[in-house]
Amino acid sequence: MTDKRKDENSGKLLYCSFCGKSQHEVRKLIAGPSVYVCDECVDLCNDIIREELKDNTLSPKESSEELPTPRNIREHLDDYVIGQEHAKKVLAVAVYNHYKRLRNGDTTKDGVELGKSNILLIGPTGSGKTLLAETLARFLDVPFTMADATTLTEAGYVGEDVENIIQKLLQKCDYDPAKAERGIVYIDEIDKISRKSENPSITRDVSGEGVQQALLKLIEGTIASVPPQGGRKHPQQEFLQVDTSKILFICGGAFAGLDKVIEQRVATGTGIGFGADVRSKENEATIGDLFKQIEPEDLVKFGLIPEFIGRLPVTTTLTELDEEALVQILSQPKNALTKQYGALFDLEGAELEFREDALKAIAKKAMDRKTGARGLRSILEAVLLETMYELPSKEGVSKVVIDESVINGESEPLLIFENTETKAISAE
């Protein structure tokens, strides 16, 4: 092989045999026997070969013999999600069975057809529904996307079409249908598309029962035709075909008021008379017990249509997090918030320390706001705002200490400087 410099003395203008660009339009032109190739075409060929090798090589989690067991999945969830032990066990088994079905086909050697087990998560805001789904997808190394049920409408109406969910999933895997078919879709706020009454509606309900009807086929399994990257701008392009029967759908919602529906059915009698307004810990435990007794008929009374419930055969409930669980969430998981902020402070050369009483004060604030674990970050952000603003401008800070008084707004964080005595300094 020779480069273009050896042919320049002849005065003849040389061109790439692949793309047709001249030697003046590229950085390098490599010569072979009566053929030339430019550096741009070499890079393109390398990319093509790299992609094919990547597609033909299964990741460890894609081989059936190395499919994580339910115990493996549960242990990984334990690293990131505090509490919700029963929900984690149910999810681990359902996800394992789903991917075992994908790897071995829908039909066993005995001719038994394996059904699809989509999942319904019921639990209060901030109890970990979204985190569980995200952690599962990350552990299994599969494409993951989220959708908000409140933005969905039937096709032809203003709003987001249900098939846009598959479009988002394709975007996460560079529009590769085969990869998308191994993905997980989490649909949040599913309780918000309940119909207004238990009886079938005779009027069009485009954001309630209508969306449930539109989601039926998608969740059960259909061949969805999705426009490629260009979408409607390039109508001449062929649509991508995605088999949604291979996609795992997880739906989640708070289902506020569902406990009253269950209570009426089991007739516990906790909502009548002098005890009606009493909300003690004992009463809250009773509500938790009620959720464990959930039946499909309760979801029908709540407003989900029977056909939709049938497409979500695996149902599990998450309990409301107590103060102790919130304290653990702040410090124990691998990506705990205190560890995240600690890493940010470490980049500034300072150690961030949270005293135990500070963690309890943060948890108490989150409990008062009734936002669950979701409200923890906003509390920490507000507490650390001034310190994070001033710290890059201060020199010699080796440690920042946060205690209960800082969380309650009674004092400033304690800044410890290198080679100096410990003292409290305002972040202003």
UniProtKB/Swiss-Prot annotation:
Q: Carries keyword Mitochondrion?
A: no
Keyword set, alphabetical order: ATP-binding, Chaperone, Metal-binding, Nucleotide-binding, Zinc
Q: Which InterPro entries match?
A: AAA+_ATPase (IPR003593), ATP-dep_Clp_protease_ClpX (IPR050052), ATPase_AAA_core (IPR003959), Clp_ATPase_C (IPR019489), Clp_protease_ATP-bd_su_ClpX (IPR004487), ClpX_bact (IPR046425), P-loop_NTPase (IPR027417), Znf_CppX_C4 (IPR010603)
GO MF terms listed in the record are:
ATP binding; ATP hydrolysis activity; ATP-dependent protein folding chaperone; protein dimerization activity; unfolded protein binding; zinc ion binding
Protein residues bound to ATP: 124-131
Amino-acid positions noted as binding Zn(2+) in the UniProt annotation, renumbered to this chain? 16, 19, 38, 41
What's an example Gene Ontology biological process for this entry? Answer: cell division
The Gene Ontology CC terms held by the record are: HslUV protease complex
* Family per record: Belongs to the ClpX chaperone family.
Question: Could you tell me which NCBIfam families the record lists for this protein?
Answer: clpX (TIGR00382), PRK05342.1 (NF003745)
Chain's role: ATP-dependent specificity component of the Clp protease. It directs the protease to specific substrates. Can perform chaperone functions in the absence of ClpP.
How is the subunit organization of this protein annotated in UniProt? Component of the ClpX-ClpP complex. Forms a hexameric ring that, in the presence of ATP, binds to fourteen ClpP subunits assembled into a disk-like structure with a central cavity, resembling the structure of eukaryotic proteasomes.
- UniProt-recorded name of the protein: ATP-dependent Clp protease ATP-binding subunit ClpX
Q: Upper lineage ranks?
A: Bacteria, Pseudomonadati, Pseudomonadota, Gammaproteobacteria, Vibrionales
Which gene is this protein's source? clpX
